[in-house]
Amino acid sequence: MIKILNKSFKPRLKARIRQNRRVLNKNLDNFFEWVKGAELIELQECNVEEDPVRPELSNEFRTGYGRKIFGVKYRGEIHAVMCFAYTNEIPRTVDELEKMSHDAYLQSTLRDQNIGRIAIAYTVWSKKKGGGMLIVKEVFKKI
């Protein structure tokens, strides 16, 4: 009895595994397809409630002196966001980040319009898999 079940079961199992493998490969291709059509844009504001790292920071802070917000847009929807600041030193706290980015901005207005030497990404988040890595690569290509 077991031999009969074993003989009929093995081919069906192998066929099902092959079919599942095809479906899985197709789904993986579709999973990252959105990355190819995404574009990097500079944002004037973002939904701070979605920020898992620093939701306490306002949009005014994020777009203040020497600070910018970038997003990855795909089909009219933002899928990843990155906030960063230009500074001349590496800050240890958010207060230091604010002071250093403001200072770097003021120095740039008096000099040659080069805002800070260091770009600090102080918050990055993504709604889709692969979005965080994509936005980091694209923003640092741009700056």
PLM regions: where:
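Amphipathic coiled-coil/heptad-repeat helices and related helical stalk/stem segments
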Residues: 53-54, 105-106, 136
